[in-house]
Each structure stands twice: as structure tokens, then as C-alpha cells.
């Protein structure tokens, strides 16, 4: 019998604590929750572990402030960083969170040199590229959670529009995890039926736009923070696909090297996820308009990467 997987979650805020909890509930492995705030991850982890007898989950959960306790992790999920506040775009967080991601990634690479890193911190695509650059890991072992969350939001809005089960809906959202993401109605179906057969074009466009600003809608409603239930579950879906070698196709932020005409930039594309992380980028046949939108989205990410390079974060 193989040993249980070790999952480290960096950052014990709302997203991080829920990633840890959902990993434990699904018994994906033993979980280490780490944060710079003294005693806080220990308290949250203890509370979670005290819940395990009630549902009979066989996962150990520990909290720590010491990266030595994260050594030899199979997967490291990085959620640490400042969340968005009302009126902020994800890009406004660039310099604040770059310092955090650089420091965290250096520790991750030191203690878990064979791990797969999943980045959740915004601005997502740029932070994922920074983590890849700092870690020195191969590109398949550093990826970002983005498109599967955006696709889940698109699916939720379609289900609300049609009054059908979300289980019936498949959707694909590509591009950077920002306001210029690229939902693809052409690749979106309800029980195999294209949504273009079920929803008028103007309503599809409204749902696409709501998906683009879906995170901001929640920030505006909450007023004191950003979304965490859906981002956490979207992340855990990726963790599960990798640890169980499920070979699932999910849109995530991966390093493009020529795919879709995008070079040297992390961007949301359909990825085959398995034990090696991103095992393949799937190239869809996009229309000219879809491809232009995807490349424009990647261009915005490139602008953020250029700033990080100028500031000395990316070598």
C-alpha cells in the first residue's frame, strides 16, 4: 500500500482553510495548513481535526508557522496574499502579492522540490508565472486555478437562467483570470445540447458578461472580502485530478509555448491533469474572434509579467 499524499495549503484565510477542509472531507491526503500569523493555522487545523470523528474522515490536519513541517509535500496550494476589496481589480494586487508569492515559493522549492504547485493568489496568471520562475520547477508542475472556477460560475448562471440542474451543463472558459476572460458559448452544452439552441444571443452575452465580473459581484456584495467557497472547491477539484491521476480536462493557467499562438505566458487553457500536473495542453479549433480574444487576454497577462520583470521579481 502506498503512503498517503501530503497536501500543504499556504495561507489560512477563507480560501486556504476551505481548501484544507475540503481536502480532508474528500480524504485526498494528510493536510498541513501554514500561515505567518502565529497560532491561527494551528487553531483552525485543530478545529477541523476535531470534526473528523463526527463524519469519520481519515485525514490528519495540522497547522504550523514553520515550513519545515511542510517538507516533502506532494501538492502545495498557494492561497496566501491580500484579497480584493470593493472597487479593486485583480491586477491592483500585483505588487502587494508578488512579494508574498516570491517569499512563499522560495520556501516551497526548498522543502518540497518534487511537489506540484497550484497557485490561487490574484492576479492569478501573473502570480503563477512568478511562482514558476522563482521555483525553477518544470512548467508541468506549476499551474494556476482559474478557468475551472470561471467555468463553474458560467455553468451556475446558465443553470439559473434555464432552471435546470448544474450537473447537465458543461462549459469552457479560457484566457486570463480577469475581466477579459474568454467564455466559449460554442463549447458550452446542456445535456449535450449547445446553449445556442436554448438561450437567445442577447441573454448568452449577458451571462458571459456576468461570468467575467463574477468574482467582482461577490466582492461588491460581501464588502469586506472576496469569494471563497467556489474558489476552494475549484482548487480541490484540481488537487484530486492530480493526486488520483484522473486525466481530467480542466481549464487552468498553464505556460503556453506556442499553443494558440501564445508564447512564454501563463494563460487559461484546457489542460489534461494527471499525476505529473499539466500533462498536455489541449488545442481547440477556435474561430478567429475567439482566438483574438484569447490572445488579447494573454497580452494583458504579458503586461503584468513585464511589470514584474521591470521590478526585479522575475529574472
Curated annotation (Swiss-Prot):
Superkingdom as given in the UniProt entry: Bacteria
Residues bound to substrate are: 84, 90, 122, 153
Residues annotated for NAD(+) binding in this entry: 11-16, 35, 97, 120-122
The Gene Ontology biological process annotation of the record reads: lactate metabolic process; tricarboxylic acid cycle
Disulfide bond sites: none
- Specify the enzyme's EC class, one word: oxidoreductase
User: Could you say which EC number(s) this protein's record lists?
Assistant: 1.1.1.37
Catalytic site positions: 177 (proton acceptor)
A GO molecular function assigned to this protein is: L-malate dehydrogenase (NAD+) activity
UniProt keyword annotation of Signal present: no
Keyword line: NAD, Oxidoreductase, Tricarboxylic acid cycle
Q: Which reaction does it catalyse?
A: (S)-malate + NAD(+) = oxaloacetate + NADH + H(+)
Alphabetized NCBIfam families for the sequence: MalateDH_bact, PRK06223.1
Q: Which family does it belong to?
A: Belongs to the LDH/MDH superfamily. MDH type 3 family.
Its biological function?
Catalyzes the reversible oxidation of malate to oxaloacetate.
Protein's name according to its UniProt entry = Malate dehydrogenase
Q: Which gene encodes it?
A: mdh
Amino acid at each position: 500500500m502506498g503512503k498517503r499524499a501530503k497536501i500543504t495549503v499556504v495561507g489560512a484565510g477563507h480560501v486556504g482553510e476551505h481548501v484544507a477542509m475540503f481536502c480532508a472531507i474528500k480524504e485526498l491526503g494528510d493536510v498541513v495548513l501554514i500561515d505567518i500569523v502565529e497560532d491561527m493555522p494551528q487553531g483552525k487545523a485543530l478545529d477541523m481535526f476535531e470534526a473528523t470523528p463526527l463524519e469519520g474522515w481519515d485525514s490528519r490536519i495540522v497547522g504550523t508557522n514553520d515550513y519545515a513541517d511542510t517538507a516533502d509535500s506532494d501538492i502545495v496550494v498557494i492561497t496566501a496574499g491580500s484579497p480584493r476589496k470593493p472597487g479593486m481589480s485583480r491586477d491592483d494586487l500585483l505588487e502587494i502579492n508578488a512579494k508574498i508569492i516570491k517569499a512563499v515559493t522560495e520556501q516551497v522549492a526548498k522543502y518540497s522540490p518534487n511537489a506540484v504547485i497550484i497557485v490561487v493568489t490574484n492576479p492569478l496568471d501573473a502570480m503563477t508565472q512568478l511562482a514558476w520562475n522563482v521555483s525553477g520547477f518544470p512548467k508541468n508542475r506549476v499551474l494556476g486555478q482559474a478557468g475551472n472556477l470561471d467555468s463553474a460560475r458560467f455553468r451556475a448562471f446558465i443553470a439559473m437562467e434555464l432552471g435546470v440542474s448544474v450537473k447537465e451543463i458543461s462549459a469552457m472558459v479560457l484566457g486570463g483570470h480577469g475581466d477579459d476572460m474568454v467564455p466559449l458559448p460554442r463549447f458550452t452544452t446542456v445535456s449535450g445540447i449547445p446553449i445556442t439552441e436554448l438561450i437567445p444571443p442577447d441573454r448568452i452575452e449577458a451571462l458571459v458578461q456576468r461570468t467575467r465580473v463574477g468574482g467582482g459581484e461577490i466582492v461588491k456584495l460581501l464588502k469586506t472580502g472576496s469569494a471563497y467557497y467556489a474558489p476552494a472547491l475549484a482548487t480541490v477539484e484540481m488537487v484530486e485530478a492530480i493526486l488520483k491521476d484522473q486525466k481530467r480536462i480542466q481549464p487552468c493557467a498553464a505556460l503556453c509555448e506556442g499553443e494558440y499562438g501564445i508564447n512564454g505566458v501563463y494563460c487559461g487553457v484546457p489542460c489534461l491533469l494527471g499525476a505529473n500536473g499539466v500533462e498536455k495542453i489541449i488545442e481547440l479549433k477556435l474561430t478567429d474572434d475567439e482566438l483574438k480574444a484569447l490572445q488579447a487576454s494573454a497580452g494583458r497577462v504579458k503586461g503584468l509579467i513585464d511589470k514584474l520583470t521591470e521590478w526585479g521579481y522575475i529574472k
